[in-house]
Amino acid sequence: MPIHASLCFPGVCAVTALALATAPIATAQTAPAPETPQTTAGTITTTATTPQASVNAPDFQTRIKQMLSAAWLADLYPFTRDADISDEGYEAGLALALRCARMAPERRPAWDMVLLLADQVEGGTPDEARVARREALAALAKLDPFDDAVRLSRLADAIEAHPTADARVRAYEAILAPQNRAALGAPAAARLAYQLASLESRIGNTELFSRWLAEAVKADPSYPTAAQAAAGYFRMRVADPAADIELLSIAVEANPRDLSTWSALLSVLLDGGAFKSAERTARMAIAVAEAERRNELVYSFTGDLATALWGSGQRQEASHELDLRMNRLTEDYRRVISLMDPSITNERLAREFPPLPSTLSIAMLGIAQKDGDTKKFDLLLERALRGTDAEVKRAEDQGSSTADVGSFLLQRAVTLLLFGKDLSTVPKLLDDVVKSGALGDQGKARFDAMLAWRQGKADVALKALEPLRANDALAQYAYASALVDAKRTPEAITEFRTIAETHIGTSLGLLALDRLSDLLAQPKLVAPQLSKSIADRAEVLNTALAKHLPTTLDEIIDRPFRALTVEVKPSSTLIGPYESFTFGIRIRNSSRLPMAIGGDAPISGKVTMRSAAPRPGETDAAELPPQPLLIDRRLRLMPGEEILVTVDADLTVVGMLLNIQPLDSHLVSVSVVSNPSSASGGQAPGFLGSVTGAPPIQFTGVTVNEAWVKDSRALIRTAGSIEAVTRLALLIHAAADPALLPESIRGDAPAIWADIVAAWKAMPETAQAWILGVMPRDTPAMAPLVEAARSSTSTTVLRSWAITRVSDPTDSMLDVCRRSGDAELAKLADAVQWVADRRSKRAADEVGLETERARTMPKDTGAGSGR
C-alpha cells in the first residue's frame, strides 16, 4: 500500500506525495566514515544551467531566446536593486523576470530572480507572488531534482497553502512520519521539524515546540539553526552548567563560525572556574574571530583567554599572550588609521591605541600590577586610557547618544579608580557621566566613595560603601580594599574571599583573588583552592567539554584551509564575442565533520566572484565589481562529499564585460572567495574560506579590417543564423565610432549603416530586441538604426528599449510603451521612469548641482538616451 494511503485526514496526501516524489539526497545517508578511502561516489553534481542533454547546439529560436533572456536579466538585476524602486517596480520586475524564465526555461538564473522578486511583492500582490513562486520552484525542481533548497521550498509552499494552523501542523506531522524519514533524508527532516517547532511556538504549544526542536537536532545535529535554538531554549530550563556545555558544544560544532555561541560557551566555563577548558575554547574563538575580521570580538576573546590563564595560575603565559596579541592588534588598528588619514604623523600614530573592553583592560593591568613591573604597568595604563579616548571620539564622530558617550567616560573613570595614580580628572569625569544620563545617583555615590578610598579616606569610604557592597561587586571590592587601608585585615580577607568565590572567572574576581593571596602570603592561589565545591564544579565542566566538543574541531580551526577544498574551472579559456560559457565551482568537505550549507552555516551559501581585466588600450588590470553567487543547492556536505555548481557566465560581471566591449581583446583573471567575510563586504574570505583562482580566460575580441567588414556585411543577411545576429551586433559596435573603421572604407559608412538597418529589420523580433540590448551608447553615426528601432511596434523590442536603454525619465519611448496596448509593458515603462527619475536626482544631489544642472543642461534632442 502506498505510504500516503494510510493517512486518515484530507489535504495532506498531496504534500506527502510531493515530499516523496522529489528525489531524496542520495549521499546524505551514505557518507563514508572518516577512515574510509574517498571515491568519486561522494560527488554531488548540480544540473548544469546550460542544457547538456543533447550534443547538438540549440536551434536558432532556442539560442536567441536564451541570449535575449540573459540581456534583459543583465539590466533587470540593477533595476530591481535600485534604492528607490517602488512596489510597482518590483511587480513589473517580477513580470519581466517571468518572461525571461519562460523564454529560457532550461537556465536557472531567471527562475532564481523570479523567486527573489516574488518574495518582494508578496505583501502587495500575494496571489501573483504565490503563482510565480510555484512556477519557479517547479521549473527549478526539473532542472535539478537534487536541489535541497528547492525541495524544502516546495514543501513549505504546499504546507502554507493549508488554510489553518492546525491543518499545517497535521501536514508537517504526516511528512515527518517515521515511514517517510528515509525518503526525506536527515537534513531535510531536521529542517522540516524545526519549521514545525516554530509553528507550534507561534500557536503557543510549548511542549510540542520542545519536542520538535529536539527532533530537529536529533535528525541532523549539524543543522546550525536548530542546534543554536536548542542551546538557547533548553539552557533556560535546566540549571545545570554541564548540560549547558553539552548544548553549546553541539551548537559550536554545528556552526563554528557563529561567534555568539563561542561567547556563551566561554561564559559558562569561566563562571564555573573551568579555566583549562576556557583556555582551549578561547584560543579557538580567537582564531575564528580573526578569520572573520571581527576585531571587537578578538579583543573580547583575548580578554577571556587572559582571564583563563590568569585564573589557572599561568600568569606569565597570560602576560605573554596579551603582549603578543595586543601588539598585533595595535599594529592593525594603526594601519587602519593611517589608511583613513594619510597625513597623520608617526608621532601622532604612536599615541593611537585600539579601544578595549573593560574586562581586557582590567586583565592586562591586574596581571602587570601583581607582577610588580612598574614600567610595563604604566605603559599598559596609558594604552587603556588612550583606548577609552578613542572609543569616546568614535562615538562622538558617529553621532552616538550622550548616554553612550557617557558609558565610555565611565569606563575611563573605573580604570583610573582601580589603577590610576593621578586621580585629579576623576571628579569631572563623574560629573560628565552623570550629565550624560549614563550614571544615576546611587552609582555616583559608589564612585564618590571609591574616590575617597583611593584618596586615603578609608573611614569615609567604608561608611559609604558598606550598605552598597551586598549587591555591588565593584563596591564590595573597594570596601575590602578600604578595610586593608584601615588595617582591618581579617575582615578584608573575608570580603576578598567572598568576591573571589562568587565572581569566579571575572577580572574583578581574579583581582580579589590576587589581593587575597597577598594577604594570606600564598604566592600562587587559584580559585579551586578556595573550596572543594569550586574544584569539583570546575572538574565537571572540564570533563563535559572534553566529552562533547570533539578534537576534530580543534584540527579544523588549527588548519582551516584544509577543511574545504575549492576548485574553479571555466568551460573554456578561449572565448569569442558573445560566446556562451560557464564556470564550474566545486567545493569539497575535506574535514572529518559534517558541514551545513547556508546563510548561517560553516559553508556559506554564497561565494564572491572577483575578476580583473585590462581596460582597452591599457596593460594594467582593473578590478571589476565583486559579485555574489549562490551555491546553496545542498543542505550539508558529509566528510568527503563535494558539490559542483555550474554558473552561466553571461550573467556574471565577466560575461557582461564580454557583451559591453565585444570588440576588445581581454585576458581576464577570475577567482572565487569562499565563505566571504561580512566584515570585508564579502571581498575577503572568512573562517574556512579561501581565494581560489581559475585559469586565465582569453577573450579573443575582433580585428576590424576591411576584409572583416566586407565579410560581416554579407553574413548579416543570412536568415536564421545566430552568427549573423552576433556579427550584426559586432558590426554596430565597429561602425558606431567611425574611428574604428579602416580609413579606406570610412566613406562607405552610410552604405554600411543601410546594410545594418536592412539586416536588423529582416530579423525576428527576438533578435532585434537582443541587438537593441547589447548595442553601445548612442552615437550620431547610429541614428539610422536608432530611428528604425524607435519606429518598431513590437512589444518585445519595446521591452528591450525600456529595460536596457532608458536612462532619461523624459525619454519619449516610455510613452510609446504605454500606448502599446500591453498593460504589462506599460507598467514596466512607469517603473523604469520612476527609477530613472530618482537616479537622475540622486546624481544631481551627489554633486550638489541640481539647480545649476536644471538651468544649464540642454534638452535631449538626440536619437536615444543610451544605456
Language-model-detected regions and their locations in the chain:
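N-terminal leader/linker segments that initiate helical-solenoid repeat arrays
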Residues: 26-131, 135, 143-153
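Structural motif corresponding to the intra-repeat A-B loop/turn of tetratricopeptide repeats
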Residues: 87, 121-123, 161-162, 203, ...
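Alpha-helical repeat scaffolds
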Residues: 90-99, 127-143, 166-180, 206-217, ...
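Residue-level recognition of tetratricopeptide repeat
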Residues: 116, 156-157, 198, 232-233, ...
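Low-complexity, acidic Ser/Thr/Pro/Gly-rich terminal tails and inter-domain linkers that flank the onset
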Residues: 517-577
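Short beta-strand elements
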Residues: 677-722
